[in-house]
Amino acid sequence: MILYTLHGNGYQDIAQLSSCQGATVYVNLTNRCPCACTFCLRTTKKMAETNSLWLQKQPTIEEVIAEFESIDISLYDEIIFCGFGEPTERLDAIIEISKYIKKINSNMPTRINTNGLGDLINKKEIAPLLKDLIDTVSISLNAPT
C-alpha cells in the first residue's frame, strides 16, 4: 500500500475509500530502516510479511506520483511521508514527490515522520534540500539508541 490513511482500526488504501474529505494521506516509500526497535513490527519477520504496510517492492517515484494523480489532493488535510520504514532512506523520492505536491497545491501541508537519522543515512545535511517542500518534521524518540 503506497498511499493510505487511518480508517477505523486500521490502514486503508486511499484508492479504496469513497469519502476521504479531511483525511490525512500517508506515503509509504520503503521497508528499510537503520534502527531495530524492539517494539517495531519490522523486527518480527512473520508479522512484517502479513502487515498491510509491508511493501513487496519499493514504489518508483513515477508510481507514487501516478497514485497522487488518481486522487484529488485538495480533499485532504495533510500529506505525511511515513510507513513501515524510514522515509529518509528514499530522500530522492521525498524531494521529487514533494515538488509534485507543492506544484499541484502549494498550500498542502507536508510532513515527514522520521527517526531523525536522515543526515547519517544520506551522509549529508538534508534539511536544506527539504526547504520549501516539507513543512513539518516529526522526530520519533522511540529508538533504543
Predicted regions and their residues:
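Flexible loop residues that form catalytic
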Residues: 45, 84, 142
